[in-house]
Swiss-Prot record:
InterPro entries: CcmE, CcmE-like_sf, NA-bd_OB-fold. Signal peptide: none annotated. Residues 1-8 are cytoplasmic. The chain crosses the membrane at residues 9-29. GO terms for biological process: cytochrome complex assembly. This is Cytochrome c-type biogenesis protein CcmE.
């Protein structure tokens, strides 16, 4: 092989190896920062992984909020109008957290099917709905045949 071609082949091989390593490192870093969203229906059907950081959300079921008077622990149910999931959280809830409102929580689903949240986010006004919750509510509406308003009034 001609020395110039050999040198060119080595340079191209080195560039390909460096780019492959860079892409691999970026993919590894991004994999650890991806938090997938699961609706209460998906969680109830076993689609959500256990003990992995995920996001879950829905509408807070009216009358489901239970606070511990001695600690900052709170438990409440969220629904997509098909299934309910219990969320446990230790901390101060957002000011906009209310029963009947949409929330998104980040945390882990334990072996008992209870979502242990490390962060709870509430919607910021009466018109905003997180896209994940909007999609979950539309899917629930399609499968039950009821309007979201009529189902929401029961919760």
């Amino acid at each position: 092989m001609h020395p110039v071609r050999k040198k060119r082949l080595l340079v191209i091989t080195a560039i390909v190896l460096i780019l492959s390593a860079a892409v691999g490192l970026v993919m590894y870093a991004l994999q650890q920062n991806i938090n997938l969203f699961f609706s209460p229906s998906q969680i109830a059907m076993g689609e959500a992984p256990l003990n992995v950081i995920i996001r879950a959300g829905g509408m807070v079921v009216k009358g489901s909020v239970k606070r511990n008077s001695d600690t900052l622990a709170v438990a409440f149910d969220v629904t997509d109008f098909q299934y309910k999931v219990t969320i446990e959280y230790r901390g101060i809830l957002p000011d906009l957290f209310r029963e009947g409102q949409g929330i998104v929580a980040q945390g882990k689903l334990n072996n008992d099917g209870v979502f242990e949240a490390t962060e709870v986010l509430a919607k910021h006004d009466e018109k905003y709905m997180p896209p994940e919750i909007t999609e979950a509510l539309k899917n629930a509406q399609r499968s039950t045949g009821e309007s979201a308003e009529s189902v929401q009034s029961t919760y």
